[in-house]
């Protein structure tokens, strides 16, 4: 089936890629805009001109009158960049809020796609950087390039204006904290990094709960429940808002959508019309016509919901099937189609840089890594993440030259699969580094593309040659153009996902390696469209873990795409604490920021202090701070990640693993962190509180700025903050200082689980971490 996937949500100013799934490169595809809201008048006030500070304003951006593409001056349906006569992939660039309805004509028939567009979130802002901030003498600067997520890190596109002694960029971006690079002479080595804050509300978030209730109850909340003779499916949105939202979760509107793949337009509209506030009700007997096969082939009814205030949140989904579709005693079976694998409940992850793990003498191969699996097992980890293992001319492996073959210096595919089997024998899952945003320019596909072979003309994205910052002297295919690349990565040109041939190729790559490994870490996930990742998530086995590299972390990569995300908020805060630029209590700021961004599940974050792209924490901030930072990652919700060598005292990012001269005490410290986390379910639960017992912790001797404390409870206990009961809890105390801290703790806490169940008195000496019960 070439259906284009679930309903999509976006806002004015943010385009959406739409594409057929499972594409046939030889097929013909054509998109058509069937319905759209009336185009915005020139005098309409856009959101970024109003500057709302209240997160729950009254203006909802309704659908309004509809119009077609021919009646508007702005082209909202932009064809993909290919040389094909048809348009398999298009980009919806909405100019007004409301509902857009599209049709895809494909070889297997026509398919309907809806896109809900919310009002423009962007706000006019001015970014100013003193000329003296750039690490280059002012007289030597003849141009400056801005590099940030809002231009996809494409250099030489956005240029600030020189105004007096400042470089000034006028732009419009959504509310939030934005990291901006100002690059003198387009050179990343001469960049100045600036943080710019745009005021405004955070995003609401939701999860979906389902139940089945009897119909015909006059006391029920909705007409469907009162008027239906028979059981009624109830889908409730559990909504939350950031602490600074200025409104109650009950004030948040929720829009429900029935998946167009599962119901005809009339049935979908009837079902959606039953929604009231934050609840959707559906008579169970209306679900019976959904059964189209057995449990494996029947998709059921997919119901989506999105919260909206001044900004919209991430879409959540539930799949429901009536009893005649599946074997169950309940009238309806409801599942989360995007739930993480059962084995991936807060797993501890160990990243190995595959070309230095054997140490400073032996070359690292799959066989040598396999011989060291007992060591990895001794650390108590659940997942082994290997940096790229495919053919590449580089040590780091991110310049792929063959997606079908492993790197010859590492070993054969058979040797790789032997390593995977050895890990499985040790109950360790293996995550594969999936690098499909780009290839090496030495890949035969790019070489044929650059040489003008027609079959490869659309394989890579092209752009204006004036944007080149590498002085490469690219082969020109059309009007002084060049291949597109991010940053100054001229050796890894971007693949063109507008091409169905490329999509087919890379989906086959996904299929091939999904049959071998247990998960994918998606390199440069932010460079690839949401639509493609949604297809990957629906395509791979349910027990395959998906981890995204999105910098900074973005909740929209969680809506039916990835299970785990790089927690860049905590990473940045931990480094600020280590450098002395923030107090230890700033750990709470990182969690608050994730909520503000719109992340619903704190367990969906990968917590880390370093990786193969970043400096070693210990080298930058010292041993004691490094221990404390690691302890934070192991005592918060989510998945702690240890980068190989972190536990041995390595101070070079990709240098040889320290086997014979490593820090054994530090290794034991990490083993103990893993042991305590495994033994204490509350350390893996979702609930974190920085008030209550945590606020009672008093530093009597030591530096209070270097000490933080937080409670770990089950998430429902955290939510019930007004309860008089004292639920089971653990109190975590972390000390980032070089010297021990003496702290007073609540009387009812008696044992330190991190120190061999040592008894706790009125006060406690904390070297690095204490976990109190």
Regions found by a protein language model. Give the residues of each.
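Carbohydrate-binding surface patches
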Residues: 695-746
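Active-site-proximal helices and loops of the catalytic beta/alpha 8
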Residues: 511, 518-519, 523-605, 651-672, ...
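C-terminal beta-strand-rich structural cap/linker in extracellular carbohydrate-active enzymes
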Residues: 216, 757-773
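Substrate-binding/active-site clefts of carbohydrate-active enzymes
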Residues: 343, 355-358, 389-411, 416, ...
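Aromatic-rich carbohydrate-binding modules that target alpha-glucans
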Residues: 120-175, 185-200, 262-277
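Aromatic/acidic polysaccharide-binding cleft in carbohydrate-active enzymes
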Residues: 606-664
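Solvent-exposed segments in extracellular or luminal domains encompassing
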Residues: 83-99, 278-298
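An acidic-aromatic substrate-binding cleft motif
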Residues: 325-372, 379
